[in-house]
From Swiss-Prot:
Assembly and binders: Muscle myosin is a hexameric protein that consists of 2 heavy chain subunits (MHC), 2 alkali light chain subunits (MLC) and 2 regulatory light chain subunits (MLC-2).
Coiled coil: 802-1927
Domain IQ: 780-809
Species in which this protein is naturally found: Drosophila melanogaster (Fruit fly)
GO CC field: A band; cytoplasm; myosin filament; myosin II complex; polytene chromosome puff; sarcomere; striated muscle myosin thick filament
Residues the entry annotates as binding ATP: G179, E180, S181, G182, A183, G184, K185, T186
Function: Muscle contraction.
BP term (GO), one: epithelial cell migration, open tracheal system
Major location (coarse): cytoplasm
Region entry Actin-binding, spans: 656-678
Positions of region (Disordered): 1822-1862, 1922-1962
Molecular-function GO term, any one: calmodulin binding
Descriptive protein name: Myosin heavy chain, muscle
Amino acid sequence: MPKPVANQEDEDPTPYLFVSLEQRRIDQSKPYDSKKSCWIPDEKEGYLLGEIKATKGDIVSVGLQGGEVRDIKSEKVEKVNPPKFEKIEDMADMTVLNTPCVLHNLRQRYYAKLIYTYSGLFCVAINPYKRYPVYTNRCAKMYRGKRRNEVPPHIFAISDGAYVDMLTNHVNQSMLITGESGAGKTENTKKVIAYFATVGASKKTDEAAKSKGSLEDQVVQTNPVLEAFGNAKTVRNDNSSRFGKFIRIHFGPTGKLAGADIETYLLEKARVISQQSLERSYHIFYQIMSGSVPGVKDICLLTDNIYDYHIVSQGKVTVASIDDAEEFSLTDQAFDILGFTKQEKEDVYRITAAVMHMGGMKFKQRGREEQAEQDGEEEGGRVSKLFGCDTAELYKNLLKPRIKVGNEFVTQGRNVQQVTNSIGALCKGVFDRLFKWLVKKCNETLDTQQKRQHFIGVLDIAGFEIFEYNGFEQLCINFTNEKLQQFFNHIMFVMEQEEYKKEGINWDFIDFGMDLLACIDLIEKPMGILSILEEESMFPKATDQTFSEKLTNTHLGKSAPFQKPKPPKPGQQAAHFAIAHYAGCVSYNITGWLEKNKDPLNDTVVDQFKKSQNKLLIEIFADHAGQSGGGEQAKGGRGKKGGGFATVSSAYKEQLNSLMTTLRSTQPHFVRCIIPNEMKQPGVVDAHLVMHQLTCNGVLEGIRICRKGFPNRMMYPDFKMRYQILNPRGIKDLDCPKKASKVLIESTELNEDLYRLGHTKVFFRAGVLGQMEEFRDERLGKIMSWMQAWARGYLSRKGFKKLQEQRVALKVVQRNLRKYLQLRTWPWYKLWQKVKPLLNVSRIEDEIARLEEKAKKAEELHAAEVKVRKELEALNAKLLAEKTALLDSLSGEKGALQDYQERNAKLTAQKNDLENQLRDIQERLTQEEDARNQLFQQKKKADQEISGLKKDIEDLELNVQKAEQDKATKDHQIRNLNDEIAHQDELINKLNKEKKMQGETNQKTGEELQAAEDKINHLNKVKAKLEQTLDELEDSLEREKKVRGDVEKSKRKVEGDLKLTQEAVADLERNKKELEQTIQRKDKELSSITAKLEDEQVVVLKHQRQIKELQARIEELEEEVEAERQARAKAEKQRADLARELEELGERLEEAGGATSAQIELNKKREAELSKLRRDLEEANIQHESTLANLRKKHNDAVAEMAEQVDQLNKLKAKAEHDRQTCHNELNQTRTACDQLGRDKAAQEKIAKQLQHTLNEVQSKLDETNRTLNDFDASKKKLSIENSDLLRQLEEAESQVSQLSKIKISLTTQLEDTKRLADEESRERATLLGKFRNLEHDLDNLREQVEEEAEGKADLQRQLSKANAEAQVWRSKYESDGVARSEELEEAKRKLQARLAEAEETIESLNQKCIGLEKTKQRLSTEVEDLQLEVDRANAIANAAEKKQKAFDKIIGEWKLKVDDLAAELDASQKECRNYSTELFRLKGAYEEGQEQLEAVRRENKNLADEVKDLLDQIGEGGRNIHEIEKARKRLEAEKDELQAALEEAEAALEQEENKVLRAQLELSQVRQEIDRRIQEKEEEFENTRKNHQRALDSMQASLEAEAKGKAEALRMKKKLEADINELEIALDHANKANAEAQKNIKRYQQQLKDIQTALEEEQRARDDAREQLGISERRANALQNELEESRTLLEQADRGRRQAEQELADAHEQLNEVSAQNASISAAKRKLESELQTLHSDLDELLNEAKNSEEKAKKAMVDAARLADELRAEQDHAQTQEKLRKALEQQIKELQVRLDEAEANALKGGKKAIQKLEQRVRELENELDGEQRRHADAQKNLRKSERRVKELSFQSEEDRKNHERMQDLVDKLQQKIKTYKRQIEEAEEIAALNLAKFRKAQQELEEAEERADLAEQAISKFRAKGRAGSVGRGASPAPRATSVRPQFDGLAFPPRFDLAPENEF
């Protein structure tokens, strides 16, 4: 196998190709709602999966997975595929086809390491950026010869499809691997080539191939060479192909590899001398520098530092993903495999290194001149040495080249820049020509001169590129990709639909909008970019500027794809124009395009190169004209444009057009490579990048055309030829291929929508052709099986006939020997023996003479035959030589014909192009005419519209007049309103003036006050200073009071909110604890249920084992019966043998004459015994047949009766289910009544004090409920009685099941016999098929002999005619010459007659041979017909046996299913009963806890009522305080001016406090939301638990119904089977024992069921109570919440009324105590949760111990299984020993049989006694044989018992493993719950810590305020004590401080700033 496929490890590729079953189950179990699931756009992920929550008009609310909800327009919402299409292999199969679905499928497959996906007709490959083992030898074998739908998506599947299409359709194929740069095209191309080399590998290997590698290896090894010299690192790709290549892989007629050739396109030469910072040059430069091949660096004169060579070190010099040393070794090995000589390799390396050295040649400016001169000769010397030329001459030609001016050559001096440019051009030219020479050399190596029939082309073109700097190379690359995309679009969307129309298929043309013609025309059409570039290249004075201007003037604004470039970013070069390609808009910089297009070289240096000593350098420049014009192609090879001047763009266009022509002549296969991200990281998908590529590549449109259209098609003759095997008789008389194809398709019963019949082809939808192939394979399989059976039948008949002939011959020989033994002692016979030889003595001599004469004649004939044979051989040799010559000439003609065909194909393609152009022009003309007609129609419409508009204008004028009148009215109203506004403005101005006057008055008063203060200060400075200090202190005091008031207000609000929040948290904590306790009880009950379930499973397993043992016993009895039958049949066979032997003895006695009377009596006795044996045999056969018929009849009757009984049981089960459903409905009604009662009771308890009289009504309702419960108890008893009846019926059903199992075993034995017969028939069919093949081979040989004989006969006929002609000539001569020559004529006549006689004899012999061959042929044909009939009969027998086998299988399967269903339903009902009993006990406990909680709530309700009363009292006090404050406000009205500033400060403080309140409310709402969310989660958990119980109850009801039906059916079957009980007495005994055990079990189950029923009823009552209690708790919680809201309102009002600091301080202390208590309760809850956590840990440890015990049990079971396996092997060995003993006994019997024959030979002498002894001995031997057979049967039974025991142990082991898995799942769930509890504890602690921190902060602020107030009070007291006497201006302050009150604002009283009342007044 070629190395790129085989050198990887053969790892299992399955995980990288298939979606595992487990993952598929996970994917398909994802939640999905077809109406709600949707995709919405996202900036980062492209699309997000969500669920529609609500719809409001065009806006849709979509909930995402993280809980986020987004509102989005409905048109942006996309549908979602069902989960079954998750990670689908072919996206054409998706039900919903849109961009998000395609993106999601590709992304999920990429994440699952599945990089290949089908997209309709083509394959999408995403670059994984890492190695996957999907290209190994093992993987390649998976895809070899497989259809696309049989294997997962892969590049190998596409490759194999192309290979098969090439061989099947005889059409050249092409594989177009496209995509952007870095998408993985080159790697996929290498894998494709390696695969084709593997598939087409030839098995022949000769010595020459071994020395340089096979053709397959050579094809593969071209990749390393081309990659080394043509690939480089770019920004987007570390191994980017910087050239395009089209590799043709040629195959011979048999599909074997016959050679290859490579075409390359546009190597990026500029990369040789310049690279960007993040890129590097071609790999070969860095590979040579790695030095991995010894001696190369020395040959190339290279150093170890890459930076010594500037032209290859301008960017990156190393690549992380590429090992240059290893790659260089592979490149060097590839040279060897491709047949490069050592000299050629070294020359390649030298030229490559010389390019590196040329970049280091240095030059400088000479003095004051413009000319350059060399700056050192070191690098130039190395270049000259490597090139094999003179250094001085090289520098001379570079600095002063000779140029041609007119007809003369002149020397031109160049400056440094010109010389540098010239060296760069030489570097590029040398490397480009070296690359082309390498390609040419590879093509020569791959040209094997073998016969080529078809090829597969693989295209690898550089992908679409958008860089920061895009030049001429990028334009050419992008133009190529544009053409390929257009080709793809044309193939997929245009040609496909045009072919539908051309073929007459009903099809509506779909315009996918994928036409790229405008962009292509912009580049390549006349006056396009390339044409303008070539035109500018012709003009000597043209520059880049003129080229840019011409482009802009020609296309800007006139061609849509030609656009202005975007402004450059900082540091970037400006672009000159931009083109809108299919993959995006690209900005191009045209700097240097003219030089690149001209590609000039220094002709003087080229001439020097052509004279160098490096042969390779001379060869690569051999086609360059140079200055002398002596190139190989100078005469006519490049005679294009302008006298031999050819540009790079024109050559590239020609290559591209040739490529497109080649692709159009092939059948294309597309592979789309996708780059997932720009970072080259594996497993990362950039959604927008991938979506852009999908849109550009037409992936969605390709899927749509594949789904809507008919991608597969075949010509009618081809279809008929390939699929005529499906219905050969139906199309036998049809000559029209179309009609025949239609008949063939209709015979397959395909849906008409899956195919269409065109004029010349039949079209199929995707995947249908694969179904046709499956039909064909199935048909071929049947035919081959029939042929094999026919041949085997023929061989069997032939062998049987031979045995019959041998038997007859043996009898004849035996008879003759017996006669001889009788006659040998007879004297007369002895005399006759002596006399007979003497009678023939006289005739011996005559016989000898006759034989000698005959021998002589034979020798003469032999000599004549030899002579004729030699002549014929010579003639044959001559004819063979002529044939060889004709074949040679024919092959030459074929080659010429192939050339003509290729030319014809090219002309046809050109014709098609012209026709397409003509068609396009005609279509455009039609479109223009349509447009003209449309314009005319539009003109008419416009005239009509104008007339209508005129009418509208008139109407509008009338409306305008009316509007003007309305306007006048409105203007009058507006003037009135303006007057009113002016009046209001005057009032406002008056008010403003009054306000201003009031302000001035206030200001005056302030000024007077200030003047008075100044006067006082002037009179008493010290006093003024003290007063000033007092004022400052008072201001500080006022501020402190305000701050304290604000703080106190905030503190009161925060504390009130905190208290409310803590109360709500406490309630929630209590609810949480209750729910947690309920969950814990549920978990414990679940564990107990699980334990009981396991116990029941153990019991079920025990019963199953008992059933299996009984079945095994029945099987043993059946086997014993069968053994008895076999023994009986064997005895009958031996009896028949004895009868036959008696007949033979009778014949012998008759021959001997029967001389004695004893012999006569013996004969009579023997005949009597024989007749008796015959009668016994016939009677036994008749009895056996009658018994068999009775058994069959009984079996059929039993089956019918069982079916009827099953139906009756099903009916009874349905009836019981109906009754149970009725009871269940009554139970639900009772529960509803209980719930209503609970609600009434709760309401009565809430208003118990006011509504005490309603208690009697509640009591009456309770009595009614008790009566209902009593009725329910009665119904329960009734149900228990019915349940006991059902159990009794179940017992009867189990007995019937045991009988059915016996019948099933008998059917199984019959099935095994039928299978054995079918196997024997299949073997006979195989034998007949082999014989048939041999006969065909013999028949072919005979036909060849007949043809050879016919040819020989024809030759002899020609010779005869020739002889006749010669005779005629001689006769004419004789008549003319006369009698003179009569003697000569006579002699000639005799000769001719002799020759004529010989010819006639030869003809006669040949005719005889022909006649014999004809007879042989006829005989063989008759035998073939006989064999055909035998095969038909065998097929009929086999089909009948298969039908019987299927019928028996079906019957057995139905009974198995019925028995399994009954057992499963019984187990399920028992399990559910146990579950309900445990649930009942659990609900009882929950009910008791609910009662306790109810009492606690009552007490709490009473406490809250007391608190409410206290609060109402406080509200009254608050009202009185408000009245006092209102009086104080009136007294302080006079101080309004003085306190205005304080009012403003109070307003600001109020705003701050309101903000704080809002923040606190926001925090409170968040806390409430969190609490509500947790409550909702708990409610959902409880609801899920309730639903689970309800589902279990429903399943129990269903199982009870099934049991009832099964019991009824079993009763009916029992009645019908009673008639057969007498015939099955032995089985009845065993069944009675099993029935007794079953009765015991049923009684036990009945008792358990009664207990379970009782427990179930109790559990239901408890559950109803718990549900009622839950409802009461919920209503109580709602009522408490309402009361809390009311209390909160009252409390806030009370707080606003109590603004004294003493009350605030007391509240603060109370709040501190409450927070401490709350903290203590939270700590207690934490400790409780920790204890629960420890309990859960202990439960987890117990579960782990149980799991360990289960594992130990499993290990024990495995040990037992191993022990039983050993016992099984021992039993098998014993059985083999018994078999050997049986064979030995059979051999002994055979020997005794021989002795019996000898004894019979002596019977005449021995008489009657000897016969009796022998018969006695025979009977003894038969007894021994029977005993031995019984022992053998016992051994077989023991063996089967052991096997069954092993199976049981394995089953038990599997059950243990499943139990272990269930335990592990339970452990995981408990661990998850533990984590949830921990998280809840942490959240509660965080809430408590937050509340405590808030309280401490408030308390701290309060203490600080109190300290500041105390200090201020002390200071004021001191200053007032000192300055009380002199306080003149302050004496007007009337109010004492104890009653100082804030002013009123907006109707609310502010709390007092401060109060100095002592603490004992609090």
